[in-house]
Amino acid sequence: MGLNYPVDLEAWHAWQQRQNTLRWVKGRAQNMVRARRGAQQGMVSGVLYTRGAIPRVLIVLDSFSPTSRNALLEPLKHLEGVGVALWCPSDASAYLNGQYASTRYSRKDWNAAPIRADELAEKLPGVRLVLSLGHYLPRGHAAYRFARERGIAYWVVQHGLLVPHAPPLPIGSTLLAFSDEDAQFWASGRRDVQTHTVGSQLLYRAIQNTHGETTKSLGKILFLGQMHGAELPRASFARAAHSFLKRHDGIYRPHPSETDKLSRATHALWEIEGIAIDRSTTPLNEVPNPVVSVFSTGVLEAAIRGIPAWVYHPNPPAWLEEFWARYGMNRWGEDPTPAPEQPAVEPAHTIAQLIIDYLEAY
């Protein structure tokens, strides 16, 4: 099994927009606005941060989400001797200190300036490698065009768990994957894509943060919401959660993205039926309750902490069963999901070393 759209990015975008009629209409309107705005203002822009005399690596962020920061900024700790440029959507100074800064560089060592996509070649003549999450978002796509036009390597870092609905990899790219199985899944038989297995920085850090200790499980089962997702129909996510919660007297924890009117109405209806809704802001990695979900990463994060965790769906499609097997997630009624094995070397360090090796061989 592999991707539904292993090569065609436009077909993937079209599928994504069609998943929800309201989302599709809204997306069409937003795209028209962006197109008009783009014609007036030029093209994709952002803030360019540079350190070192001549940047050799361009790291591209389309957001500052935790998964994006873990995948793309953590390697900075191990790239002290390499000139680096960061292309970000907005001010990133808060993320260029502390855990993402090395001992050699700190926030004050970065120069910042606004930049448009058509200025990349002029301002970054020494770049030999682009690192991103893929070419399916604006900056990642613009950086891919920049790389293709100049014959520059384009590397994609896996930042989340893979489903068949994931976007295709760019033609001629190099994938840095969580596992050999994920590399094979995302490449989907393509011969133009090279792969390296590096592990998940997010899960690696979760293991390090436990300090070898486990958390005592307390309280009712939390069902982790995913009604915002496009991988399954909203009704399928809702049916899985509702049937489980009514049967096992659990608590529903909405995903942070479940803020639309339909999601809020669903939460309110469930409360009338007697289903408890967790509206707290306590981070999931601090919650002691056992967890269940359809396929949330939170299942693996809970397992790492020693918290009992399972997956559940009353009628899972074949791809979901394959997903559960690939990530070692156990179904409700089986033993709790075991903590995933992690590499001996920090993934961010492995990524940095691969970059250094590539630049030295260039």
Question: Which role fits each region the language model picked out?
Answer:
Residues 1-13, 20, 325-362:
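C-terminal amphipathic helix plus adjacent low-complexity
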Residues 63-68, 93, 136-139, 227-233, ...:
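Short acidic, S/G/P-rich loop/turn micro-motifs used as interaction or catalytic elements
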Residues 172, 193, 197, 297-350:
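Catalytic binding pocket for nucleotide-activated donors in carbohydrate/polymer assembly enzymes
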Residues 2-10, 42-52, 58-201:
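Active-site and donor-binding regions of nucleotide-sugar-utilizing enzymes
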Residues 1-35, 46-66, 86, 130-132, ...:
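Short hydrophobic beta-strand segments
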Residues 68-76, 198-268:
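Conserved catalytic-core segment of nucleotide-activated headgroup transferases in glycan assembly
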Residues 258-305, 309-310, 315-316:
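Donor nucleotide-activated moiety binding/catalytic core segment of transferases
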Residues 90-101, 137, 246-278, 325:
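Catalytic donor nucleotide-activated moiety binding site of glycosyltransferases and closely related
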